[in-house]
Amino acid sequence: KGKIGLVQAEGGKEIPVGRILARKVQCHNFQDAKAFLENGGQKGRQTEFLTTGTYRINPKLFRVTSVDISFVKSNMVGIITVLDGEPLEQGTIAGPHITGHNNFQDPDAFLTAGGRRGLQEQVVLSGSYNFNPWFVTCEELPMTEIPISHVGVVVSFVGPEGQDVSGA
């Protein structure tokens, strides 16, 4: 409990140039080695990981390493950096908001939806997460607190170019 299993395949196709992780294929959580190979499974570190449970996995084809799940404490925010995918678009410092990946816990959904490697606009709030550390890092930072009777000014470094409407 409180762990996930990272999987490294010892056989399969080569990972495409420019990528560091092998994409998910249908193989019943790595329990069907034949399906893994027939469905185009790639050799190396996998985006897919195993959650708590018992699995019948061929140790000659797959190496499984247990790691702790990630936690973001209360009053903290998780700053996400993705380690795989297409590079950020030129002139941007963070990847755009992507939906449907369950807070970066489904790397394949993130990549399929056009997610990019690097710093992300989206943050994660306090809680526990099944992050694949080969795919994502999460840096905890304190939430911004504005005291009563004060105001906060936000300066954004992401998003479309603004337009000066001041008339100057």
Label every PLM stretch briefly:
Residues 1-168:
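Interfacial loop/beta elements and low-complexity acidic/Ser/Thr-rich segments
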